[in-house]
């Protein structure tokens, strides 16, 4: 049985992702309060696999998680893209007329801004987790409170779904990374199926340095699907570039990494894995 560390409670979007990614397999979920705790679990027990959100089509990149990934020593072995759908739920004995507050993660509240604007009588309260909000209300039987979470979480905690699909934008997707101890990577993904990689590198303050790297990647038929820059702490005005690459030929991709290595100050391959639509 695989042990999967996630940020959040049972019923959270990380939990849904874990069950979808490992569909048909027996898994044990380890609920963590923070993303730091996810990586700490992998460090303590090399058999643990982690699920980590990295970007959302509306909220953007989770910048802190890029740094956690780089510093953790783990490797990326997969990705999963989840359609985020928000519902509002409450205790079975409550209804619209009895509700006073709605609790959820700040990002979920932001993504349901129009719905909340249409219900000015509901006080929006920030919480640490979407599913955790539903769990708290259910376990403490708090009358007058509602939670914004997935309908999956609502049903898990015996809550009543008042309305589904309350998010502003239907094109709301989160991309999650599956990470593990590097020595366990071969057991979780066949390298011959890899057609995507995540790398990070820094560059010297030379004119055209980034352009030269991109030109070489293009020569090897490597496609950039994302590039994210973050300050390199301790090195003024120097940046780390987190890049996602896709390719058709694993050998050509690895040749491209060899070719750009002399042009960068530091380079690290964060993972090689199969791209998901």
Question: Where do the language-model regions lie?
Answer:
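Domain-level signature for soluble enzymes in the chorismate/prephenate branch of the shikimate pathway
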Residues: 1-277
